[in-house]
Amino acid sequence: MQRYFIYFCYDGTAYHGWQIQPNGVSVQETLQNALSTILRQRVEIVGAGRTDTGVHARMMVAHLDLAEEIECEQLTYKLNRLLPRDISVFNIQPVDSNMHARFSAKWRTYRYFIHTRKDPFLRNYSYESPYPLDFELMEQGAELLKQHQDFAAFCKSGADNTTTLCTIKESKWVKTSPYSWYFEITANRFLRNMVRATVGTLILLGRHRITIKDLERILEEGNRSQAGESMPGHALFLENVEY
């Protein structure tokens, strides 16, 4: 068997997340069906992670195993002809059999986009804050995250995680215009809803609803009910996966 990595991106607006769902169309199902049609065999793929409903990916990786070698450029071309316009395949390449799209990934990077002035051209891919935000204080909060490893406070209640420990490599706010920013976070792994809950908590900080000391306490106690809300998925992008 030969293992292949597929590198692709998607606009998640029309999908119920990455993972196959019984009552909604997923990115995984759409890509698997296209591969199965072209290769004339049932194909199963494994993704680098699971994005939720409405979340996008500028870079996602998945792997599949095939008994016969394929022409990667030709398959890439055929997939892009068959897939809907909101999914695009960049590249397909053979990899060692011990490479795994999910478990071999060392770092994943997400960005969450926010704007503070009404803008019809940003509304589908950025969260419009109805409140003024103190981004200097939010940057202090982002820096604080790198000093912690247990993020139970930002994990969806009832999620089946074996551990809530994560290593944060990068956590920062980046200003892109006088009224738009994005939060960028890179970690070895992410918990369910972790990025959206993190942003929701940093927004509480930016609104002066909580203090840096409160954020420290929330992280140490690991109480999800004390943290901020899970922000809408339409403004969240999986930006990169590193191996």
Label each PLM-derived region with a short phrase.
Residues 1-243:
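Structured-RNA-binding interfaces characteristic of tRNA pseudouridine synthases
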